[in-house]
């Protein structure tokens, strides 16, 4: 049974009693206790199920039962990759790596090597991400760190050490990498 919290009077109400409470409590809107989703007006009527107690407390460790997986497939809900049991993953994949997958791995390695060789300094890497559009340095650094691995992520101090700002005759500011 799904329970909701009235955000106006802070009462906890089970779903069958929500309509009654809504007529008594003026301007009431509700939040599902299990999934912390807030519902305006009568949107709560469509909310029939959400995460179970096991999902909420176990988070990444939770593995759904076969029954839950079947229900999700029947309802058309997308099941997260974390929720798939490891047995189903192993049954669908072939026993050994195929020649096609090995070729793709080799191509990926070559692409990574060529990317590392072409762009060397952090400033040049950031300038490559701008794609001739105006973007703040903060957003640019955030975008780079999102794409990069943890050991390749950049600190803002390091980036600023490698950048130089110049003004041209028109009064435009140009950001260039410092060459040593």
From Swiss-Prot:
Q: Region entry Disordered: which residue ranges?
A: 61-125
Q: Which residues are modified to Phosphoserine?
A: 85
Domain of life, per lineage = Eukaryota
Q: Name one GO cellular component term.
A: nucleus
Instruction: Locate the residues binding Zn(2+) 1.
Output: 6, 9, 21, 25
> Which residue spans match zinc fingers labelled C2HC LYAR-type?
1-26, 27-51
Q: Any idea which GO molecular function terms this record carries?
A: DNA binding; RNA binding; zinc ion binding
- A biological process (GO) annotation for this entry? negative regulation of transcription by RNA polymerase II
Give residues annotated as binding Zn(2+) 2: 32, 35, 47, 50
Cellular location(s):
Nucleus
Show the ranges annotated as biased composition (Basic and acidic residues).
100-111
Ranges annotated as biased composition (Polar residues): 77-95
Give the record's keywords alphabetically: Metal-binding, Nucleus, Phosphoprotein, Repeat, Zinc, Zinc-finger
Family, similarity comment: Belongs to the UPF0743 family.
Protein name (Swiss-Prot/TrEMBL): UPF0743 protein C215.06c
| Organism in which the protein naturally occurs | Schizosaccharomyces pombe (strain 972 / ATCC 24843)
